[in-house]
Swiss-Prot record:
Family, as annotated: Belongs to the mandelate racemase/muconate lactonizing enzyme family. MenC type 1 subfamily.
Designated name of the protein: o-succinylbenzoate synthase
Keyword terms of this UniProt record: Lyase, Magnesium, Menaquinone biosynthesis, Metal-binding
Single biological process term from Gene Ontology: menaquinone biosynthetic process
Organism: Aliivibrio fischeri (strain ATCC 700601 / ES114)
Molecular function via GO: magnesium ion binding; O-succinylbenzoate synthase activity
One protein family per Pfam: MR_MLE_C
Gene: menC
Length: 324
């Protein structure tokens, strides 16, 4: 017999986590637990403030309605629900049907969100290919350019992924590029969405020979993966995109065109983060995913991230907010 439970969690965050204009002091989310009478599986529904189109309250309503439909054996159209619900529920179904391989790719590209010295330490500990991610667009573009140039000059086998979150005008993007030496630009694996519009970002890439990737653009209505000069990758954040099936379709479209598809975190808890690592190992085995976000938390949830010493909150200790 089918049964389901929905839990709500609150996890404390590191004090330095800032999303656009908002400091994220705690991460709020939902966990859907599905059982078919034999097996039990879980998925996480955690809209990201400032980035998700839906609120947690809207996601909760959507999730309850979808869960009821599943219990009633109705046909499900997962992506007619808000993206975080479509992702979390589809992941729970995938787990329930034993279709998500256990092996994960936990070699996350380290994220520099503050002190550059911290990134140097992480990179020195890395074995194999050195790839790191730096958030740009939070400070003056000239400073960003100097920091990027410094890393590329300092570590000769380093490749960087940069993320501007559409934060620059065309002029500011140009200022950034002026401070990155042309000989180093090929080691920028890609710069996610440098400018406010895709058109400006494409023009920036053409003028600077700096490769770009689509992130926010992937979530625009009607987006399809296509060959465009300068675009070498798409970044897929499943919590913001939708069902696992939709994400896999985007991955396959990118691979068919010779582009990278990078599975990336939306600051989910360790429960969903480990599932994303498994999805990455399964569908993007040649690409290091963008999942270096566990250190932004003060606590894990249900499933521990490998080699992470943070305490783990158990779902069993949380009260179910809905069950049937």
């Amino acid at each position: 017999m089918k049964t389901a439970k929905i839990y709500q969690y609150q996890l404390p965050m590191d004090s330095g986590v800032i999303l656009r204009e908002q400091r994220l002091q705690q991460r709020d989310g939902l966990v859907i637990e599905l059982s078919d009478g034999i097996h039990t599986a879980r998925g996480e529904v955690a809209p990201l403030p400032e980035f998700s189109q839906e609120t947690l309250e809207q996601a909760r309503e959507d999730l309850i309605s979808l869960t009821q439909s599943w219990l009633n054996n109705e046909e499900l159209d997962l992506d007619s629900n808000c993206p975080s619900v479509a992702f979390g529920f589809s992941m729970a179904l995938l787990e329930l049907e034993k279709q998500l391989p256990q092996e994960g790719n936990y070699q996350a590209a380290p994220l520099c969100s503050g002190d550059p010295d911290d990134l140097v330490v992480k990179l020195n500990e890395m074995s194999g290919k050195k790839i790191a991610k730096i958030k740009v667009g939070l400070y003056e573009p000239i400073r960003d350019g100097m920091v990027v140039n410094m890393f590329l000059e300092l570590i000769s086998d380093l490749s960087l992924r940069l993320d501007a979150n559409r934060g620059w005008t065309a002029k500011k993007a140009e200022q950034f590029a002026n401070y990155v030496h042309p000989q180093f630009r090929s080691r920028i694996e890609f710069l996610e969405e440098p400018c406010a519009t895709p058109e400006e970002s494409l023009a920036f890439s053409k003028a600077t020979d700096i490769a770009i990737a689509w992130d926010e653009t992937v979530r625009d209505d009607g987006f399809t993966v296509k060959t465009q000069e300068g675009v070498t990758a798409i970044v897929i954040k499943p919590t913001l995109v939708g069902s696992v099936e939709k994400c896999i379709s985007l991955i396959e479209q990118a691979h068919q065109l010779g582009m990278q598809a990078v599975i990336s975190s939306s600051i989910e808890s360790s429960l969903a983060l480990t599932q994303l690592a498994r999805l990455a190992a399964w569908k993007t085995p040649e690409t290091i995913p963008g999942l270096d976000t566990i250190d932004l938390f003060k606590m894990q949830l249900d499933t521990s991230w490998p080699n992470c010493d943070l305490p783990v909150a158990q779902l069993a200790d949380l009260e179910a907010i809905w069950e049937n």
